[in-house]
Swiss-Prot record:
Pfam families, per the entry: Ank_2
Entry protein name: Putative ankyrin repeat protein R845
Originating species: Acanthamoeba polyphaga mimivirus
SUPFAM superfamilies: Ankyrin repeat (SSF48403)
ANK repeats: 1-14, 15-44, 46-74, 75-104, 105-134, 136-164, 165-194, 196-224
The keyword Transcription belongs to this UniProt entry's keyword annotation: no
Matches recorded under InterPro entries: Ankyrin_rpt (IPR002110), Ankyrin_rpt-contain_sf (IPR036770)
Keywords: ANK repeat, Repeat
PROSITE patterns: ANK_REP_REGION, ANK_REPEAT
Lineage: Viruses, Varidnaviria, Bamfordvirae, Nucleocytoviricota, Megaviricetes
Coiled coil: none
Length: 224
């Protein structure tokens, strides 16, 4: 299609090289190479494009950009952090081979991956030295908040503290309606009555009937 449009006289560089930018955004490497052969040039935007390609999982584009001289560690290793956040394990692994620092920004790579439930990515990062307890057990607290039970179980097995930050995990899991997570946290010693029965209050306020019933059965006092 692109070749056809070019044959009709389309200007591949119109609108500030929008065509090639779009090709990068969508991971169309062959189109990218074709447009470059016709004179398209977005080299001044390569760093930004690397971040987008890493986030979106376009490993071929990431490799191509690095072959063109883009620094894989640009912007404080933002590429590996973006890839981790979105569970792009293949890209994370590749960037690590190029020297990416997975622990930069207070272990934001493993924190974001945990929050979003990307367990394979988290396992890889931990194997490479990431601290799952960084920032007051952010990984466990936010994976609990978002209901990622397998992630929660994994993090606890790795030594995460279910009671961190005044039992943040069970309070947020309760308020968000994640019953399986709530039960698991209670089993592992979370204080479901912390902060003046905050967990059952939040569950009640957000209409999480099953969680309210469960917590009350355990001894929580619901004031409503």
């Amino acid at each position: 299609m692109v070749e056809y449009l070019v044959s009709l006289g389309a200007d591949v560089r119109s609108n500030y090289d929008h065509a090639i930018k779009s090709a990068f955004e969508n991971g169309h490497l062959q189109v990218i190479k074709y447009l470059i052969s016709l004179g398209s040039d977005v080299s001044m935007h390569y760093d930004y494009i690397l971040l987008r390609a890493s986030r979106n999982g376009y490993i071929d584009v990431v490799k191509y950009l690095i072959e063109q001289g883009v620094d894989p560690r640009t912007n404080n290793d933002k590429a590996v952090r973006k890839a981790s956040k979105n569970g792009r394990l293949e890209i994370v692994e590749y960037l690590v081979t190029l020297g990416a620092d997975i622990r930069i920004d207070n272990d934001s790579a493993v924190r974001w991956a945990s929050k979003n439930g990307h367990i394979k990515t988290v396992e890889f990062l931990v194997a490479k030295g990431a601290d799952i307890r960084a920032k007051n057990d952010y990984s466990l607290r936010h994976s609990s908040k978002h209901g990622h039970i397998k992630m929660v179980e994994y993090l606890v097995a790795q030594g995460a503290d279910v009671r961190a930050d005044n039992d943040y995990a069970i309070k947020w899991a309760s308020g968000k309606g994640h019953l399986e997570v709530v039960k698991y946290l209670v089993e592992k010693g979370a204080d479901f009555r912390a902060d003046n029965d905050c967990a059952v209050k939040w569950a009640s306020q957000t209409g999480r009937v099953e969680i309210v019933e469960y917590l009350v059965s355990k001894g929580a006092v619901c004031p409503y």
